[in-house]
Amino acid sequence: MSQMHGTATHEAGLHSGPPPRPGQGREALPLTPARRVALLIGVPTCLALTGFIGFDLVAMVGQGHFHFSHTFAATTRQLNVNAGGGNVVVKVGSGPARLSGEATYSLVRPTITERATADSATLAYPCGFPVGNCGLNATVSVPAGTAVAISSGGGDLTASGLTGHVSLSADGGDLTATGITGDISLQTGGGDLSATLLAGDVTLGTSGGDITATQIDSPRVTVDSGGGDVAIVFTRVPQDVQVSADGGDVTIVVPAGPTTYDVTASADGGNLSDSVPQAATSAHKITASSGGGDVTIEQST
């Protein structure tokens, strides 16, 4: 009995004192310079990301829309429209210039503003928040010969029948232009650009989409593609063609015939084919280059 008692007393001695707290006895990780940097970067980033997601959800819940219609002065000969992020259709119509459609917004309803002079008007739809949907889904109707500068920050832009000075820009969507005559500038930020039946001096550009232009009756054409393919088909002998593509293929098709061209072409990462009649003294010049694709210059069949 005395041995059992002694053993019990010895075990009690081993467990004497207050019970250990969870985690007691573990050493804290040292706060090294690398861990300080990770905390300084990671914590604000996580907080910012959480706040942005929450704000985006609030903006989605707080979305609204309203219909609008606006007629410009009959003397307007130059029309500038910044449609925010909506889809825009531009066409020729009778009567004074007119804009109508549906406006969307998040949280706070913006006001459509107009600044006008004797012969020009500038209309803008300033979106107050960088999240959610905000823009004008609009149709713009202008008299023939009206100079236009139309831009959309995120939607598609479609134009037809315009004449005069025409500048169209779709920062995030596709751009489609048909039957336009004059001094023409068509630009996209990342979408595809499709044009047909253009006449006059033409400038085409995109940061990342493809450019396709057919039935082009233009003496001077300048094209700059940031990453997509370029294809241009002429219905008349061009005077000066300049095409540059950072990474896509380039195809230029000119009318069949005896006309010679002064050609300067390069394909840094692809194949080069230039089968058109050539003469260094020709007044018809073609300059084409691609940073990563093929370059083809040929006559129509």
Question: Where on the chain are the PLM-derived regions?
Answer:
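Hydrophobic residues in beta-strands and at strand termini
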Residues: F72, N80-A83, V92, A103, ...
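Short linear S-[DN]-x-LW-Φ motif typified by the pepsin-like aspartic protease active-site region
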Residues: Q3, D56-S120, N137-A149, D156-G161, ...
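Alpha-helical transmembrane segments and their membrane-interface anchoring/capping motifs
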Residues: S2-N82, V89-G93, G132, S300-T301
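Short, surface-exposed interaction patches in beta-rich subdomains
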Residues: L193-T301
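A mature extracytoplasmic/lumenal domain signature
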Residues: G85, S94-P96, A103-Y105, C127, ...
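A cross-taxa feature marking solvent-exposed loop/turn segments within ectodomains of secreted
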Residues: L107-R109, N133, P258, T281
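Non-cytosolic head/periplasmic domains of membrane-anchored proteins
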Residues: A124-D210, T214
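Beta-strand secondary-structure signal
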Residues: Q78-N80, V89, S100, T122-A124, ...
